[in-house]
Curated annotation (Swiss-Prot):
This is Chitinase-like protein Idgf4. Belongs to the glycosyl hydrolase 18 family. IDGF subfamily. It comes from Drosophila melanogaster. SMART domains: Glyco_18. PROSITE patterns: GH18_2.
């Protein structure tokens, strides 16, 4: 019996060991292949990506998706990823020749796969054991054919639905009793899907184990862990769990109130579960080893448009917002600003005398090291040009890395390298400043 216990402990240690060497922390770096085909300054090609790899233990390339007809794992952009096109799958895994310690994983889903909310293919696949077989076989084939070291499961479960704002902020938050949106039923078959996902993880790991492939889980923003993941049942078949603990608040989820997107700790009069610490404690409290838990850090900010009724202080939560702020000049995504786009809007010699939409935002730091930074510009007399953005910068990312060390967690997942300042434009010299600061603190 003692010999069996010793063997079990050794196997568990080896499973964690393939993610990182003893005593080290994981630093998983996400690379969205779509950034390869962007235009202008937001285009991230492999030559520009390479300076980041000296800091990364893993490169997570995304994103693959599910073909709903065949239930197979497929490229979401064959002309980009496969050999008939740009062959980015092989180019990315080929980076291991230059960086032999780097593990390269393929990510599935990640909120980048098109899903019909009325017929979610990620749920229908789970509902049939026969549907899981082609997914598992195709996943193994893709990983093996293109030289990946494993698979990152960014399974696109239904998300928590925030309540509509009616009246005061306090009344708004008081209505939250559960993380999955109070009155709204996120998934009527949640228990069935939880059991089936447990089976999928077990079957995938069994298929991967002979080749030593890594299997990781990414808990996507606003997916209810208690609803969809049987932590004790899946954790031994997972090499890591990335908690994507950001985007708790976004202008798409709540267009009338601007608030911190990714606080470390609970804020007053907020849902107590919308913070990094709660999500970490949920998993470790359900028997997930701390060494398998990685905290996700977004390299971008979430931006709301402010109105004259939003006030002048910028102190969150800011009421009477008006949805997404205009898109940035590089990423061209309304309501989202990459770190270099945020940096360019903070006070600097180039914008200090500008007015209107080009005027600088007022930066407000976080001396408590608990909630994050934000910057804002109040609306003008005509009700225009008001912006509020909550964001991650190198300093706040470093604070989260310190939290990870303090809590004895596995590491950090940086999402996404293409939204970090990979050209060094903010300081004029330092490339990937968020990634570098995280690495310096781990």
């Amino acid at each position: 019996m003692k010999l069996y216990a010793l063997f079990s402990l050794l196997v568990g240690s080896l499973a964690i060991g393939q993610i990182s060497a003893a005593g080290s922390h994981h630093l998983l770096c996400y690379y969205d292949g779509n950034s390869f085909v962007r235009e202008g300054l937001s285009k991230l090609i492999l030559t520009d990506l390479e300076p980041a790899l000296q800091y990364c233990t893993h490169l997570v390339y995304g994103y693959a998706g599910i073909n709903p007809s065949s239930n197979k794992l497929v490229s979401n952009n064959e002309k980009l990823d496969l050999d008939l096109g740009s062959s980015l799958f092989r180019q990315v895994t080929g980076l291991k020749r230059k960086y032999p310690a780097l593990k390269v994983l393929l990510s599935v889903g990640g909120d980048k796969d098109t899903v019909d909310p009325e017929n979610n293919k990620y749920l229908t696949l789970l509902e049939s054991s026969n549907a899981r077989i082609p997914f598992i076989n195709s996943a193994h084939s893709l990983v093996k054919t293109y030289g990946f070291d494993g698979l990152d499961l960014g399974w696109q479960f239904p998300k928590n639905k925030p309540k509509k704002v009616h009246g005061s902020i306090g009344k708004f938050w008081k209505g939250f009793k559960k993380i999955f949106s109070g009155d709204h039923v996120v998934d009527e078959k949640a228990e069935e899907h939880k059991e089936a996902f447990t089976a999928l993880v077990r079957e995938l790991k069994n298929a991967f184990r002979p080749d030593g492939y890594i299997l990781g889980l990414s808990v996507l923003p606003n997916v209810n862990s208690s609803l969809f993941f049987d932590v004790p049942a899946i954790i031994n078949n997972l090499d890591y769990v990335n908690l994507h603990t950001y985007d708790f608040q976004t202008p798409e989820r709540n267009n009338e109130v601007a608030d911190f997107p990714a606080p470390i700790y609970e804020l007053n009069e907020r849902n107590p579960e919308f913070n990094v610490n709660y999500q970490v404690k949920y998993w470790t409290g359900n028997r997930a080893p701390a060494a398998k838990i990685n905290v996700g850090i977004a390299t971008y900010g979430r931006a709301w448009k402010l109105t004259k009724d939003s006030g002048l202080t910028g102190l969150p939560p800011v009421a009477e917002a008006d949805g997404v702020a205009p898109a940035g000049t590089q990423t061209q995504i309304p309501g989202l600003l990459s770190w270099p786009e945020v940096c360019a809007k903070l006070p600097n010699p180039a914008n200090q005398h500008l007015k209107g939409a080009d005027g600088p935002l007022r930066k407000v730091g976080d001396p408590t090291k608990r909630f994050g930074s934000y910057a804002y510009r109040s609306a003008d007399d005509s009700g225009e040009n008001g912006v509020w953005v909550g964001y991650e910068d190198p300093d706040t990312a470093a604070i989260k890395a310190e939290y990870v060390k303090r809590e004895g967690l596995g590491g950090i997942a940086v999402v996404d390298l293409s939204f970090d300042d990979f050209r060094g434009g903010c300081t004029g010299h330092d490339k990937f400043p968020i990634l570098r600061q995280v690495k310096s603190k781990l």
